[in-house]
Amino acid sequence: MSDGIVIIGSGFAARQLVKNIRKQDAQIPLTLIAADSMDEYNKPDLSHVISRGQKADDLTLQSAGEFAEQYTLRLFPHTWVSDIDAENRLVKSHDNQWRYDKLVLATGATPFIPSVPGRELMLTLNSQREYGAAQSQLHDAKRVLIVGGGLIGCELAMDFCRAGKAVTVVDNSASVLAALMPPEASSRLQHRLTEMGVHLMLKTQLEGLEQTADGIRVSLDRQRAITVDAVVAAAGLRPETSLARHAGLQINRGIVVNSQLQTSDPAIYALGDCAEINGVVLPFLQPILLSAMCLSKNLLAQAGELKLPPMLVKVKTPDLPLHLAGDTRRDDLTWNIVAAKEGLVAKGVDAENQLRAFVVSEDKMKEAFALLKQLVS
């Protein structure tokens, strides 16, 4: 007997897929398997839990049982999938197995932990469960080091600073948000973080961590060292591809899918942070929403093809919020930047003076949707 559509994962992508399937078909069997509790929470809220004084349990929006009842699902929480037998269409754990008609991998992404001595001392905040394990140490910590000055690193740095903690950010790059935009566009946020008291140690290499009586001793390049109470790894995410790799699926940066979200095995699909679409991994909410809508149609034999319009990425740094869109990392763009008291507008144009990317901040974010319409993709 088949378990119908089997979904591995229970995060935002998996839940959006379930909701879209149930809008179209109330009867088709749906089975979800995940290693966590499968309770619903809003993952972006993890960037603000410290300043809000929240505990991990405070984030829960809906229990797994309520979700299963609402959408008529079979759930298997706290279950580690050990293998996918693609030839026989079986998903296996150490004490169970499920036969699928179609399988969806919504396995998300895992935090990158720099390979340095003492790396086991680093905390991560990529899930409610991870925050639950770290919350006591983080709330008690007075001195916090954040490894990584990207999107999550900047959000956490501002949040910890707003909570009254002494915050240091270490990053190899010469500017914050270096993977998202040029320094001309990120300098306003960089200045604001410094103004708030965040100590930015850019162009700096982390060399090791050691627990001492006074805290965690952090060794840096050029024979520098600092001591902190907690270290948070925010150096990026890596798509979780291990199950897909063992199943013989095509892997690049993520699990490679076509415009139907189908992997190299026609019965297996991938969705969310683990999926690589047109050579790109898109770990943002809007592409996941659109992907879930498209995939629900394909799983129900209604041909759907994913077409992604230009989309906004929001940097949730409350004291200086940013929106960006387009290919902000293109080397051939000329940036026209207008900075005023009420905010910044940075436009990246190509040799033909066509708008290819933009960044807006603060009150100027209201111009984002008009600029989106002008973007040439």
UniProtKB/Swiss-Prot annotation:
At the top level, the lineage of the source is Bacteria
Q: Where is the signal peptide?
A: none
Q: Which Pfam families match?
A: Pyr_redox_2 (PF07992), Rbx_binding (PF18113)
**InterPro entries this protein is in?**
FAD-bd_OxRdtase (IPR050260), FAD/NAD-bd_sf (IPR036188), FAD/NAD-binding_dom (IPR023753), NO_rdtase_NorW (IPR023961), Rbx-bd (IPR041364)
**A Gene Ontology CC term for this entry?**
cytoplasm
* GO MF: oxidoreductase activity, acting on iron-sulfur proteins as donors, NAD or NADP as acceptor
Q: In which compartments does the protein localize?
A: Cytoplasm
The UniProt record lists the EC number as: 1.18.1.-
Q: Which reaction does it catalyse?
A: 2 reduced [nitric oxide reductase rubredoxin domain] + NAD(+) + H(+) = 2 oxidized [nitric oxide reductase rubredoxin domain] + NADH
Q: Report the pathway entry.
A: Nitrogen metabolism; nitric oxide reduction
Q: Which UniProt keywords apply?
A: Cytoplasm, FAD, Flavoprotein, NAD, Oxidoreductase
* Sequence similarity: Belongs to the FAD-dependent oxidoreductase family.
Please describe what this protein does. Answer: One of at least two accessory proteins for anaerobic nitric oxide (NO) reductase. Reduces the rubredoxin moiety of NO reductase.
PANTHER family in the record, alphabetically? Answer: NITRITE REDUCTASE [NAD(P)H], PYRIDINE NUCLEOTIDE-DISULFIDE OXIDOREDUCTASE DOMAIN-CONTAINING
Under HAMAP family, the record lists:
NorW (MF_01313)
Put simply, this protein is called: Nitric oxide reductase FlRd-NAD(+) reductase
Species, as recorded: Klebsiella pneumoniae subsp. pneumoniae (strain ATCC 700721 / MGH 78578)
- This protein's encoding gene: norW
